[in-house]
């Protein structure tokens, strides 16, 4: 394929702060619907038998097979033998008239150089690189060159690329397809030819190896008058550039797009969006993959950070042309700290496996997730309080807070005390932000006894970190246990805050507060009932003297917003256990866990747990919080590092919205289905912070306007549901503490 370069000079629209217009004049919705992805337009990547290396697991998988789902097809690839599980395959080098077949890859000797490396993984694009390939001839003699294999997948394309230095001849074969050459050979297994043309004011090139158009964002430094991590003068910055897609053919096609940037990007928090020329969000998804990791003392690796790669697969109808604006939202959106959720590559850090990073604003991480639980056997990893200064005396605003991380979803140890790892953990990126993220995870226990689904959402806000968690566990086979938890705040090997007090309660107030015992690997209390509506748990009372560098002075907790469970064949309420660990002499931690009720010793097929939790984090030192929310500042001045902030959140956001038009699907975060006239009207009392409000069931993304107490809301997020073929819009509405909110979504057409 010829390497082509296309550039189109248009007026540069960078650093526009204009909101999407309240009166929308975009193209016809039927036309836009034809450009939206279908249910089959996706990719996923997962370890079939679970991650090969999970910290402190005695039951590693016997196979190291990856599953790559692309569109309606799958590839099972054995990463040990470096070959597909089935079918005809050849990966060989020919040097000095000897043929060497690939026999596998090198062993893992150092986590930094882990040879199976995930570069990008998301909704539209997967890239895995296997380094340190081993080759041998028929007599067992080894090839002494260095080679790597790259696997890439789009929904409509699968390709392998073999790279090796020197003059050796390279060969790849899959089925009836074969390629040969030197240096680098590309074997495309499935590839729907694209007739899409891409034009932009930005440089556009075609990447033959990746099968997509690359669109390079400007590499231009930002000003930073105060020398802060995120430049204060750019808090409300939004960048926009024009992109045009065209298809002159008589048949539909797909435009595969890759937006790239390496430098001068606030990499910890941003959201790319494809919008109409007037700034109206279209709902066309853009995958967010990025990396900031480097460890020069260990060496430099291909694909180490920093970089951002944004991927889109846009259907382009025949004989059509459409103008878009590619928009980058950074720290704030409409004056509210924006939410984002991205795949973060670990190449340059180590382990090189799956990692997700979510942020409110662009001031460092807010909460991270490690599908596979590789490094510290915890799914919930780094967690940081929002807009909270670290303890250093010269700390500045708009930068990284310290870490209060650690937590997990399902934890099961069998009757012999052996940790049961999870397998087939896969990620479904439904929305990257900037008003409300939506990412789902699915996995199951190694023997298929329990199927687990977890959904995490991060809302934009200006007060404190909230994370909405929705859990669903279905029992498929009988299980017994020495230890079973449906959720952990503070994991066994990741629990950064030495908090000394635990409290439980409900909407009415405090139920009980106590100081857990200081012990090692044993329970303090077991199966304490969480009674009453809006039950909550607070972990506070930070022992400052035990804080180490980088650990946050923060209190944490969670609210049980909804709970349904059948355990042992009977309806079961939530219960709490507190589990003690010790990280070195006298360095004690307490994990709080949701567990089965007392007396239940076995789960049977048909048992389940379904829960909605709200995880909250607060600064434990009032003076450290520098955010703009006056109500939170007053609360922390009185009650920081106590149970009261968690109770306030539980009661203050126990919303009871009433719908005059449309249907309430969920009270908090509020989800409203519009009526047949594409209209909704809802009233509610109170609330705290900014309330995420989502309207679903829209037949078009434009022609709507939200009135909040009669005033139009000017910033929103649009998402497309490919299963229902409908749009939804999400707003962040400032709460009326003690007051009333009237919300009306108007159909302006």
Regions found by a protein language model. Give the residues of each.
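Polysaccharide-binding surfaces and accessory modules of carbohydrate-active proteins
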Residues: 166-245, 250, 258-278, 478-566
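N-terminal secretory signal peptides that target proteins for export/translocation
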Residues: 1-9
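Extracellular ectodomain segments of secreted/surface proteins
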Residues: 33-34, 204-259, 641-693
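Beta-strand-rich recognition/accessory modules
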Residues: 31, 182-214, 287-354, 527-665, ...
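Non-catalytic C-terminal accessory modules of carbohydrate-active enzymes
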Residues: 109-114, 120, 128, 423-443, ...
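Extended, loop-rich substrate-binding clefts of extracytoplasmic carbohydrate-active enzymes
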Residues: 60-62, 79-173, 179-184, 190, ...
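Beta-strand-rich N-terminal accessory domains
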Residues: 27-97, 199-239, 247-251, 320-403
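Bacterial N-terminal signal peptides
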Residues: 9-23
């Amino acid at each position: 394929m010829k390497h082509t370069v296309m550039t189109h000079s248009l007026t540069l629209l960078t650093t526009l702060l204009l909101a999407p217009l309240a009166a929308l004049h975009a193209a016809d919705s039927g036309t836009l619907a034809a450009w939206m992805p279908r249910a089959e337009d996706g990719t996923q990547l997962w370890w079939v038998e679970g991650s090969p290396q999970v910290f402190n697991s005695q039951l590693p998988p016997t196979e190291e097979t990856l599953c790559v789902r692309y569109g309606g097809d799958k590839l099972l690839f054995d990463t040990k033998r470096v070959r597909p599980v089935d079918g005809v395959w050849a990966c060989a080098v020919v040097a000095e008239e000897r043929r060497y077949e690939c026999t596998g890859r090198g062993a893992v000797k150092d986590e930094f150089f882990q040879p199976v490396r995930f570069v990008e993984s998301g909704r539209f694009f997967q890239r895995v690189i296997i380094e340190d390939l081993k080759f041998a001839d028929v007599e067992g003699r080894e090839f002494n060159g260095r080679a790597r294999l790259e696997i890439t997948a789009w929904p409509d394309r699968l390709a392998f690329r073999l790279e090796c230095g020197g003059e050796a001849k390279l060969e790849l074969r899959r089925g009836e397809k074969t390629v040969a050459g030197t240096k680098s050979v590309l074997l495309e297994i499935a590839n729907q030819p694209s007739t899409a043309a891409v034009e932009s004011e930005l440089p556009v090139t075609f990447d033959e190896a990746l099968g997509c158009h690359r669109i390079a964002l400007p590499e231009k430094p930002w000003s930073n008058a105060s020398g802060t991590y995120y430049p204060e003068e750019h808090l409300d910055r939004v960048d926009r550039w024009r992109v045009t897609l065209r298809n002159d053919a008589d048949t539909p096609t797909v435009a595969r797009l890759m937006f790239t940037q390496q430098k001068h990007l606030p990499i910890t928090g941003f959201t790319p969006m494809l919008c109409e020329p007037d700034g109206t969000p279209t709902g066309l998804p853009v995958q967010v993959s990025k990396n900031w990791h480097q460890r020069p003392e260990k060496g430099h690796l291909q694909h180490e950070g920093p970089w951002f790669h944004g991927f889109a697969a846009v259907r382009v109808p025949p004989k059509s042309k459409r103008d878009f604006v590619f928009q980058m939202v950074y720290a704030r959106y409409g004056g509210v700290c924006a939410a984002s959720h991205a795949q973060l590559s670990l190449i340059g850090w180590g382990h090189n496996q799956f990692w997700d990073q979510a942020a409110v604003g662009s001031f460092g991480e807010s909460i991270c997730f490690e599908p596979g639980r590789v490094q510290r056997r915890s799914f919930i990893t780094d967690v940081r309080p929002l807009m909270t200064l670290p303890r250093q005396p010269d700390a500045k605003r708009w930068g990284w807070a310290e870490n209060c991380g650690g937590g997990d979803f399902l934890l099961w140890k069998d009757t012999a005390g052996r940790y049961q790892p999870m397998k087939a953990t896969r990620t479904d990126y439904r929305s990257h932000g900037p008003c409300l993220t939506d990412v789902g995870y699915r996995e199951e226990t190694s023997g298929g006894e329990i199927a687990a689904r977890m959904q995490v959402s991060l809302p934009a806000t200006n007060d404190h970190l909230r994370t909405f968690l929705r859990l669903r566990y279905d029992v498929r086979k009988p299980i017994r246990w020495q230890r079973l938890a449906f959720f952990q705040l503070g994991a066994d090997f990741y629990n950064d805050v030495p908090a000394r007090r635990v409290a439980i309660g409900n909407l009415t107030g405090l139920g009980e507060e106590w100081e857990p015992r200081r012990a090692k690997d044993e329970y303090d209390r077991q199966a304490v009932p969480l009674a009453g509506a809006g039950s909550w748990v607070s972990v506070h009372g930070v022992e400052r003297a035990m804080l180490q560098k980088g650990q946050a002075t923060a209190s944490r907790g969670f609210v049980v917003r909804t709970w349904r469970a059948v355990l042992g064949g009977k309806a079961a309420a939530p219960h709490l256990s507190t589990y003690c660990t010790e990280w070195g002499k006298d360095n004690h931690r307490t994990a709080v866990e949701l567990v089965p009720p007392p007396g239940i010793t076995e789960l049977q097929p048909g048992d389940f747990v379904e829960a909605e939790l709200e995880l909250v984090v607060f600064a434990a030192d009032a003076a450290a919080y520098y955010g703009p929310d006056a109500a939170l500042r007053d609360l922390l001045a009185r009650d920081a590092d106590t149970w009261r902030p968690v109770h306030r959140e539980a009661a203050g956001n126990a919303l009871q919205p009433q719908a005059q038009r449309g249907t309430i699907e969920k009270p908090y975060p509020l989800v409203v289905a519009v009526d047949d006239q594409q209209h909704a009207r809802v009233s509610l009392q109170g609330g705290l912070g900014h309330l995420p409000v989502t309207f679903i069931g829209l037949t078009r993304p434009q022609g709507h306007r939200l009135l909040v107490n009669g005033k139009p809301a000017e910033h929103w997020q649009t998402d497309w549901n490919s299963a229902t073929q409908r749009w939804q819009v999400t707003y962040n509405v400032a709460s009326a503490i003690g007051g009333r909110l009237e919300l009306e979504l108007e159909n302006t057409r």
